[in-house]
Amino acid sequence: LVQDFQTEAARFSDGIGVFATDLNPHMSSACHVADRAFSVPRIDAAEYIDSILELAQQHDIGLIVPTIDTELLKLAEARDRFEAEGIHIVISDAKLITLCCDKRLTAGLFAQYSIRSPEIYERDRLVFPCFAKPYDGSRAIGAKKINTPADLTVDITEDPKMMFAQYIDIENTFSEFTVDMYYDRQGRLKCAIP
């Protein structure tokens, strides 16, 4: 992704650089190929936003493209601070991010627009097999197929963040597709990457 940004930046000007940040830049592939890389605090640290803003100001950065889902809400909530400094963050509004970060709310959003999605089960009305995952999870951490009631461990059943959904067999019945879409500042689709 960084190399794609570098290629596109070179089409506009020789002076545009692509910078990257990470808690541990030496462990980040993006930081290794970026024109410059910087260490920043963890996303859950109080000083995270200030550190990103300071870096952007110090290095005349005018555009920030978040690539980690866990940073989206914090950056969306701080958007006005960045915009006041002439720094644009390519990000959805905080309300939409909140809906997308809580899978229970995402299901409601899909239903509102008649988009089919897996049924969410009440804990006492599970249908097997089902799929268990934290409602606010990321990167499939904690996600698990539950084949039978015997697969329900105490850790799973007592975790208040765990939700249960209809199991969708993406290996044999359905295909999963991910599409990243980028819009301009007027909301026009500029690029769709499957």
Predicted regions and their residues:
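A conserved helix-loop-beta module that forms one wall/lid of the active-site cleft
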Residues: 83-149
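Hydrophobic anchor at the start of a short beta-strand
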Residues: 18, 117-118, 162
